[in-house]
């Protein structure tokens, strides 16, 4: 790395420390040319995949929209605001670490539904009614029966 003081092209790493809370590495560097020390912070550049809607349009993932949809689905259910926030955080984390460039909206809905079914079946049913494409009421009933039967592993 180039020294910020003298622009010497080669600096030495004196010390490296992992910063768990930020998923980063802090490095202390030393310039052999001018003798000055400086620090760097290295983080991985993770990109959020774009969401591909049913109309094949790409749009950025919107955590607030997911939070609003979960809040609407959780009305009159036992799902707490903290559980909603945790579901949003978990979904964001899974998307970041998936390594995918794009994710279909149906796959995103399934990802959220798996977590919701584990927490609150009533909220999951409301969310599914809004976000899964059912051709007819029988398909919805079939999905619901499978979700209840597998205990949230639908």
From Swiss-Prot:
Keywords: ATP-binding, DNA-binding, Metal-binding, Nucleotide-binding, Repressor, Transcription, Transcription regulation, Zinc, Zinc-finger. GO terms for molecular function: ATP binding; double-stranded DNA binding; zinc ion binding. Its cofactor is Zn(2+). Residues 49-139 form the ATP-cone domain. One of its GO terms (biological process) is negative regulation of DNA-templated transcription. It comes from the Bacteria. The keyword DNA-binding applies. Negatively regulates transcription of bacterial ribonucleotide reductase nrd genes and operons by binding to NrdR-boxes. Belongs to the NrdR family. This is Transcriptional repressor NrdR. It comes from Neisseria meningitidis serogroup B (strain ATCC BAA-335 / MC58).
């Amino acid at each position: 790395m180039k020294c910020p003081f003298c622009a010497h092209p080669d600096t030495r790493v004196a010390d490296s420390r992992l910063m768990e809370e930020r998923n980063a590495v802090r490095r202390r560097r030393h310039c052999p040319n001018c003798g000055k020390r400086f620090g760097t912070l290295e983080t991985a550049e993770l990109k959020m995949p774009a969401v591909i809607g049913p109309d094949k349009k790409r749009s950025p993932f919107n955590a607030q929209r997911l939070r609003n949809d979960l809040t609407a689905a959780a009305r009159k259910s036992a799902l707490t605001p903290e559980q909603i926030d945790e579901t949003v955080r978990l979904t964001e984390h899974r998307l970041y670490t998936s390594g995918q460039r794009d994710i279909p909206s149906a796959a995103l809905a399934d990802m959220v539904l798996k977590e919701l079914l584990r927490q609150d079946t009533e909220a999951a049913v409301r969310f599914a009614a809004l976000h899964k494409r059912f051709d007819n009421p029988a398909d919805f009933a079939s999905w619901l029966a499978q979700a209840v039967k597998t205990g949230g592993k639908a």
